[in-house]
């Protein structure tokens, strides 16, 4: 039997989401891709920076997820910013609907990765940070960095 690939298979990250939101829960979901989008994503041509997800008619869609057209794709390329359906179980969609019906909650894709040769999206239930929360997080990060430097210099 072949060994499972234990490498980091992350194809795209949304690091800005960790800065702009408090992440409450995460869900793993498949994504419906067409044409040459898989090849383009595997080449690292995906961007999750301003992406979000919405629930419409009992289905979850990823919006503003930019997948650049595949270079050799010619007529099979599709719109780079099209809405892509995310594949979740009905019970998971109902949970997400419960979260997003509350004020301040949103769905944010935070990672695109490969799992068993399939492209998956890590979808997070998130609450937006206020500006003072962002400043506090930066101060905390700087303090942690200073402590690590001091510990390293004392060795």
UniProtKB/Swiss-Prot annotation:
Required for rescue of stalled ribosomes mediated by trans-translation. Binds to transfer-messenger RNA (tmRNA), required for stable association of tmRNA with ribosomes. tmRNA and SmpB together mimic tRNA shape, replacing the anticodon stem-loop with SmpB. tmRNA is encoded by the ssrA gene; the 2 termini fold to resemble tRNA(Ala) and it encodes a 'tag peptide', a short internal open reading frame. During trans-translation Ala-aminoacylated tmRNA acts like a tRNA, entering the A-site of stalled ribosomes, displacing the stalled mRNA. Belongs to the SmpB family. InterPro entries: SmpB (IPR023620), SsrA-bd_prot (IPR000037), SsrA-bd_prot_CS (IPR020081). The keyword Cytoplasm applies. PROSITE patterns: SSRP. Signal peptide: none annotated. It comes from Clostridium acetobutylicum (strain ATCC 824 / DSM 792 / JCM 1419 / IAM 19013 / LMG 5710 / NBRC 13948 / NRRL B-527 / VKM B-1787 / 2291 / W). It is found in: Cytoplasm. This is SsrA-binding protein. Keywords: Cytoplasm, RNA-binding. PANTHER family: SSRA-BINDING PROTEIN (PTHR30308:SF2), TMRNA-BINDING COMPONENT OF TRANS-TRANSLATION TAGGING COMPLEX (PTHR30308). GO terms for cellular component: cytosol. One of its GO terms (biological process) is trans-translation. GO terms for molecular function: RNA binding. It holds the Pfam family SmpB. It comes from the Bacteria.
